[in-house]
């Protein structure tokens, strides 16, 4: 797999889970002899929702909720065959969304 690059994008609501997963990926890639760039923190997406607390009147009484989506980017520049096999066998947390692209 010469002159290839593996780009891994991670998304999660919990920043502790995403940091733990990135550490596992980086440690696995370095252990198998690949060159790693990252983890690069991407902008956090904040979704805010405003809900009326009263079912009928009192429009002034509202609750506000927020969901934060944390994102990280990892580039593995020169992956070996061992690296690809180790990443395929890696078991990450259930709350982390992983997108892998070859380039």
Curated annotation (Swiss-Prot):
Keywords: Ribonucleoprotein, Ribosomal protein. Pfam families: Ribosomal_S10 (PF00338). It comes from the Bacteria. GO terms for molecular function: structural constituent of ribosome; tRNA binding. Belongs to the universal ribosomal protein uS10 family. HAMAP family: Ribosomal_uS10 (MF_00508). Involved in the binding of tRNA to the ribosomes. Part of the 30S ribosomal subunit. This is Small ribosomal subunit protein uS10.
């Amino acid at each position: 797999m010469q002159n290839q690059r593996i780009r891994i994008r991670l998304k999660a609501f919990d920043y502790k889970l995403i940091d733990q997963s990135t550490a596992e990926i980086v440690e696995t890639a370095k252990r198998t002899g690949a060159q790693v760039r990252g983890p690069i923190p991407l902008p956090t997406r904040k979704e805010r929702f405003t809900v009326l607390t009263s079912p009928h009147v009192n429009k002034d009484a509202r609750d506000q909720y927020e969901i934060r989506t944390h994102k990280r980017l990892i580039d593995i520049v020169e992956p070996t065959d061992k690296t690809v096999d180790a990443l395929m066998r890696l078991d990450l947390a259930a709350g982390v969304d992983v997108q892998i692209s070859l380039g």
